[in-house]
Amino acid sequence: MAHTVGGCSLALIFIIMLLLVKAKIDVCKRGDVTVQPSHVISLGSAVNISCSLKPKQGCLPSSSFNKLILYKFDRRIYVQHGHSLSSQVKGLPLGTTLFVCKLACSSSDEIRICGAEISVGVVPEQPRNLSCIQKGERGTVTCTWHRGRDTHLYTAYTLQLNGPKNLTWQKQCNDHYCDHLDLGINLTPESLESSYTVKVTAINSLGSASSFPFSFTLLDIVRPLPPWDIRIKFVNASVDRCTLLWRDEGLVLLNRLRYRPINSRSWNMVNVTNAKGRHDLLDLKPFTEYEFQISSKLHLYKGSWSDWSESLRTQTPEEEPIGMLNVWYMRQHIDYNRQQISLFWKNLSLSEARGKILHYQVTLQKVAGGEITLQNITEHTSWTWVIPRTGNWAAAVSAANSKGSSLPTRINITDLCGAELLAPQQVLAKSEGMDKLMVTWTPPEKATAAVQEYVVEWRELHPGAGMQPPLGWLWSPPYRLSALISENIKPYICYEIRVHALAGDQGGCNSTRGNSQHKAPLSGPHINAISEEKGSVLISWDEIPAREQMGCILHYRIYWKERDSNSQPQLCEIPYRISPNSHPIDSLQPRVTYVLWMTALTAAGESPQGNEREFCLQGKANWSTFVAPSICMAVIMVGVLSMRCFRQKVFVLLLALRPQWCSKEIPDPANSTWAKKYPIVEEKTQLALDRLLTEWPTPEEPEPLVINEVLCRVTPVFRPPHHRSWSEKGQGVQGHYTSEEDTGYSASSPPPPRAPTAETGQGVDLYKVLGSKGPDSKPGNPASPLTILPVDYLPTHDGYLPSNMDYLPSHEAPITDPLEELPQHISLSIFPSSSLRPLTFSCGEKLTLDQLKMGCGSLML
């Protein structure tokens, strides 16, 4: 079967060769192209190229001539008429150049005759830097060399190795760019001291060159295989003793180790001899991830190092933390006896933590007495608690991992800004790039020597909603008056920066604001309320969102102008620190509608305007405009009322204008002292009452009622205070409810009708008939006869003004009295009727109804 496959392969090769020969014959069937001296020449040599036509291969008999053209690639270089052409060519470049000969029988068509390739190259250079290597004890010998310059020709390299006992190994490299070759033989360890010689020879069409012989022994060329199965062991789970283990080839005598932390770029190197796959490392750091690699060598001076082994990565065990926490605090008063203490601390570095920090222990205690007041364990880097304001307090914070705790950091809780003399001066913040700020200050003028250290504190001024900005701080010695801060610094964010000067248990502070980069704000403030307060306008607004402020805001501007006005708006510029979210304006005119809006400014420019709000100041009249007229009117009124005649008229007018519903009832004469002092005889009164009851009409047959109206003109005047008092006349005013026993009716008078209707067209004063003693009656005679008085008659002796009396019409003519022709007078008072002052009458002992007009609101004579 193998012979059959081999025969088929040979037949296929033979057929391909025949086809190639046939193709060549077919290509050059009209003529030949010859090259002298050779198709391969050295650089700078000349060559002769000839082209000739074969018999009967020229132009047709009708053609007048044969024209042969020689092309170098696609460019004509020579033309000749006839059956042959010959030309010498010089200056050919390195590499291969194609020449083609063509026949032209007419002006348009050219026929390809034949062509030739000429190769230009150089003689091979002597190979240099010949070296050989055998990888591992069971590897094969491989040699490498430097070829030198390119010959641009096909060059063959032959490697020949000569050993003891006339042993020779030879192998040729057919690659065009051959610079290494594997002999495929293994030199065994039994001949470690045997000497070997190797050389390489380069051959091409222009010549050959051989390298210098290279002699070596097995130890010189054998490169051990990299160590494998690397592992590490920590004795007692401690980093103090670490053992690195690996496996090697048997002939290895020397090892080198390198290791480094993962985040480091430099290696720690260790050389060990005859290690036998084991080495102890004593300088590893706790809780650190390391990378380990190992290399091997067979001899101290001969041979080469093996390649580095694959990396081993592992983390060392934890150890107790070292170092102390960097602690800072904030103090805030809540009320008169409580304060809030917020402690902050920074994480320990990996070299200080020496493990995973599980928690922090916080202790607060009073300085006096030293008793522990509060202890807490937290996993965060901050802690807040409320403690009393009494006494001096101190705090201690320590970090703990699985192996132990660090030393506590102790700090006294003092008023950081309580001492004004310790406050640093001229605190400034300047940008130092996209994420850095340089803070500078000057020491306090009067307490420079007392300052023990400075603390620079910063935090974002306007964090997002619901966010607590991280607090950053750093300590600075007293001789350093600047600090470069870069922790949590972002561009286009405003930071509040505070510098504290500490001296024992006292401190002073000063602050500023700064940003690393700034632009004009992206939006303006939003006005949320406009209110009027004491003639001025109070404008309140919402802060611009922190991400749209684009740096520290330096000023706010409030613009306003009248609505529908084309004039330039007025403005008020407010420094940021003075009014963070409200400001009054007192230059607006009352009852004018204004349009208001706001902008904000940073060091880079002004923001777009915020929302517009309309507002009209209602205003209040100036109190001075009312005070002067009021005083004038008061003076005039006092002057007018001081005159008696005007005062009387004014009071009469006021009494006349007083509504009826606000007046109180007139006292009932039936309840007077006179009625009780002179009682009516019971028998006659009873007879009179019986007669009245018998003559009283039934409701079915009402009798017509005739009412005589008595109109009396009166002239009211005020009585002077020197007139005799009411007591001198023996009269008084007293209000009582009229009982049936004190009331009498005339036998000839009809019973009292119902109250008059609205059809009468006027108000009527209703009265009852009053029983009275005659002029001859005496107080000691209770059986004196009943005297029926006229309707219009009222007794004046020890009598009272009537009230709540039914109207009783009179059928008798009014009794004339000489006093009726005299001017009628009445004494008025501004007091209510229930407290009327006693009146003095000039009517003698009798007062008739034609002299008296009584209403619910006045009493006139």
Swiss-Prot record:
Record region (Disordered): 722-760
GO cellular component terms, semicolon-separated: external side of plasma membrane; interleukin-12 receptor complex; receptor complex
Membrane-crossing residue ranges in chain numbering: 623-643
Motif range (Box 1 motif): 662-670
Membrane topology type: Single-pass type I membrane protein
Annotated function: Receptor for interleukin-12. This subunit is the signaling component coupling to the JAK2/STAT4 pathway. On IL12 stimulation, enhances IFN-gamma expression.
Cellular location(s): Membrane
Residues carrying a glycan: N48, N129, N166, N271, N347, N376
PTM annotation: On IL12 stimulation, phosphorylated on C-terminal tyrosine residues.
Segments on the Cytoplasmic side according to the record's topology features: 644-861
Listed name of the protein: Interleukin-12 receptor subunit beta-2
Residues annotated with Phosphotyrosine modification: Y800
Source domain of life: Eukaryota
